[in-house]
A protein has these predicted regions:
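Short, well-structured N-terminal submotif of metal-dependent ribonuclease cores
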Residues: 1-40, 53-66, 134
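Acidic, PIN/NYN-like endoribonuclease modules and their adjacent C-terminal/linker elements
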Residues: 1-3, 74-75, 105-135
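Acidic active-site catalytic centers that drive phospho-/nucleotidyl reactions
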Residues: 7, 47, 101, 119
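A generic structural signal for short hydrophobic patches within well-formed alpha-helices
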Residues: 11-12, 45, 122-123
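Anion (oxyanion) recognition and catalysis
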Residues: 32, 69, 109
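Short glycine/serine- and small hydrophobic-enriched flexible loop segments
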Residues: 50-53, 109-110
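Active-site neighborhoods of divalent-metal-dependent phosphate/nucleic-acid chemistry enzymes
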Residues: 74-116
Length: 135
């Protein structure tokens, strides 16, 4: 079973019914049908939470957390071995990207997985990781 990593961009597009929402919905359905495994870094989970809290309300952020928990996505923590944090730090030191995006990219690299995003910030990493561009 192939493993894919979601960036917060993909999930925000899904929740906000942006143009890529249908594509993300199909990806989520394939994961629910055990066609592939979906991963999300806990840092990107936090990015979705704080953006919702900041832009809408604390209650909306809690609802979004419940909505995320209901999706067929495994949340990956940073853990004690520091490999994920180290790779994210390397990406941050060598590319002009947000630190949260560096965690999504690092997770994709460490899991040899495809990153699903539409965020142009990841163009700098096209040679370092596999990226599926959502539109």
């Amino acid at each position: 079973m192939a493993t894919k990593v979601l960036d917060s961009w993909a999930l925000i597009a899904f929740f906000e019914d942006e143009p890529a929402a249908g594509e993300v919905e199909k990806i989520l359905q394939r994961a629910a049908d055990d066609k592939h495994k979906l991963l999300l870094s806990v840092v990107n989970w936090g990015e979705i939470y704080y953006n919702t809290m900041r832009e809408v309300s604390p209650e909306a952020a809690e609802q979004k957390a419940r909505d995320l928990a209901a999706l067929p996505i495994d949340i990956v923590g940073v853990g004690d071995d520091l490999a994920l944090a180290r790779q994210a730090a390397i990406f941050k030191a060598t590319h002009k990207m947000s630190y949260a995006d560096c965690f999504a990219a690092a997770l994709a690299k460490l899991k040899n997985a495809e990153l699903l995003t539409g965020d142009p910030e990841f163009k700098a990493l096209e040679k370092a990781i596999k990226i599926a561009w959502l539109k």
